[in-house]
Swiss-Prot record:
InterPro entries: 3'-5'_exonuclease_dom (IPR002562), HRDC-like_sf (IPR010997), HRDC_dom (IPR002121), HRDC_dom_sf (IPR044876), RNase_D (IPR006292), RNase_D-like (IPR051086), RNaseH-like_sf (IPR012337), RNaseH_sf (IPR036397). This is Ribonuclease D. It catalyses: Exonucleolytic cleavage that removes extra residues from the 3'-terminus of tRNA to produce 5'-mononucleotides. Its main location: cytoplasm. The keyword Iron does not apply. It is found in: Cytoplasm. Residues 213-292 form the HRDC domain. It comes from Desulfotalea psychrophila (strain LSv54 / DSM 12343).
Length: 374
């Protein structure tokens, strides 16, 4: 690996970004370590201006990554990544920029006759008949100096992105399917993807929360939101603040005084450190009106008629996707397809991605037929 391929100063980064901004598209990728922190620790950023001109940007040496932010936010130059969301979040956090004009080769593969969950290794092999070396997947990207093998591995992750994009676009059947892909890609431009505001729906990911009564679920929601903010503030994993099972224990007893936490498995140290915060979160939940409390997310069973409709929906998606060269998984997972049927038959009003945009267009005939027969 040539030394000039490593970018370790803001001045050199500016030069590379200025070259990138004159191009129609560049490849981007990151290498990071994510073990004992809330946020991934950025170890390397790779950029491909062409198949031959690739650079490794060292964020441990460069304190000012704002030039990279300028490239990320630029609406003219396409930034090509594979499985883009996590890399974009990391680079957005490092630069403060909101990414714009993104092309995700993993997503695009699902519109081009392949699967939307394909790895870069598989995709490059499938589309370019080139084998990538993945022996450095578990390497420590924070350790310096990086070896020649590490640098070669990292740059090969961006080297083929531009060519892969061209091939994928050539395999998409017609302008309508391309517009559907672009609609999906446009979602990556949304600033909400990169927000640092704690998500109030995080409690839903706590296993077992639906076994609680409604008031306790409200407490779990408030504590989970507080925990998210605290984990970000400390840059520690959520479980280092409070583990999920302890969070559920606390929510079940709804403590209003710190000493009540002695009835749970929370450590003495954590109770002393976070007791007041936990009780304040509990109080916020208990002060809510019944109508403002979250509901239990119970799984309802489908009737035999609904099961028949679900089977028809899956068959329609499979057949239509086969004709159009689209991965059926892009239309929705099993729970989403079940919700479609429940919405049609039970009149449930749930916000679904299948109720707008290209998915609604794809499924419009099915919707019409079943609305007419119910």
């Amino acid at each position: 690996m040539k030394q000039e391929n490593i970018i370790s100063t803001t001045e050199d980064l500016k030069k590379i970004v200025n070259k990138a901004l004159k191009l129609d598209a560049v490849g981007l990728d990151t290498e990071f370590v994510w073990e004992r922190t809330y946020y991934p620790q950025l170890g390397l950023i790779q950029i491909a201006l062409s198949d031959e001109e690739c650079y490794a940007i060292d964020p441990l040496s460069i304190k000012d990554l704002s030039p990279l932010g300028e490239l990320l936010a630029d609406r003219n130059t396409i930034k090509i990544l594979h499985d883009a969301p996590q890399d974009l979040i990391i680079m957005s956090q490092a630069t403060g920029a909101t990414p714009q004009n993104i092309f995700d080769t993993r997503l695009a593969a699902g519109f081009a006759g392949s699967i939307s969950t394909i790895s870069l290794l598989q995709l490059v092999s499938e589309q370019l008949e080139t084998e990538l070396d993945k022996s450095e997947t578990r390497t420590n990207w924070l350790k310096r100096p990086l070896t020649e093998k590490q640098l070669s591995y990292s740059l090969n992750d961006v080297r083929y992105l531009r060519a892969t994009r061209v091939i994928l676009l050539s395999k998409i059947i017609g302008p309508k399917i391309k517009s559907w892909l672009q609609e999906e890609l446009n979602l990556l431009n949304n600033p909400a993807n990169y927000s640092t505001i704690a998500d109030e729906s995080r409690y839903k990911k706590v296993k077992g929360v639906n076994k609680l009564d409604r008031k306790s679920i409200g407490v779990a929601q408030e504590i989970a939101t507080w925990r998210e903010q605290k984990a970000r503030e400390l840059n520690r994993p959520r479980g280092h603040v409070i583990k999920d099972d302890i969070l559920l224990e606390i929510a079940a007893i709804r403590p209003t005084r710190p000493e009540e936490l002695a009835n749970t498995a929370i450590s003495t140290k954590a109770a002393e450190r976070y007791g007041n915060d936990i009780c304040q979160a509990t109080a916020r939940a208990l002060n809510k009106k019944e109508v403002d409390l979250p509901h239990q997310q119970k799984r309802s069973q489908l009737s035999s008629q609904e099961k028949g409709a679900l089977a028809q929906l899956k068959e329609l998606i499979t057949l239509k996707c086969d004709i159009l060269g689209i991965d059926p998984a892009l239309l929705g997972n099993s729970n989403e397809l079940k919700k479609i049927i429940q919405t049609l038959y039970k009149g449930k009003t749930t916000h679904m991605r299948q109720s707008f945009g290209w998915r609604k267009e794809f499924l419009k005939d099915f919707y019409q037929i079943h609305r007419d027969t119910i």
